[in-house]
Amino acid sequence: MHLQFLHLDTFFTLVDKNKALTVPYVLEARYAETDPILGLLDRVEEDSRAMQGADPARHKNSDSRIAAAQQAIREIGWVTRYEAGTGRATALQEKLVDVLRKRNYTIIPVGGEKGSLSTEEYLLERVLFELNFQAGNVVALRPGVVVAYAENVHTIAALRMAGVEVLPFEGSYLAMWHGDRIV
């Protein structure tokens, strides 16, 4: 599976002139093969096998979905530079966050800083939990001022620590299948 399109605003949003909010690890080249999220997916696969028993037919679909997700995570965020005038493409050996760090952007992690949490706790209890409430998807009203879902307390705290004004609003309905639907 080759991932061609991604709603970038679920993983990355510019929140000020030189500040970006992003999901940790995913958009950084140094984690392309060792992203902690890949390890969590391995654990999910192991737990799934244990729950389903030894019958390979029972977990074949699960294995292929997990492998596809892992490959997609490895492929997300690589930067291609296009030359002005010619349109010639050059694939860089960098992901989006790497390029922005070289340009002195402040990178603000969804879920806030890891602190003393283990990597697994940080991902499960903060990053993925708040990502479920669209923590990476804030709306910039103007540079340095964003609207964010109030449920994402760690992300909001990280934004404020970085000097971004946050206008929170209740969006608890997101937990129910990610928002209102017309059926």
Place the predicted regions along the sequence by residue.
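The feature marks the mature, well-folded catalytic cores of soluble enzymes
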Residues: M1-V183
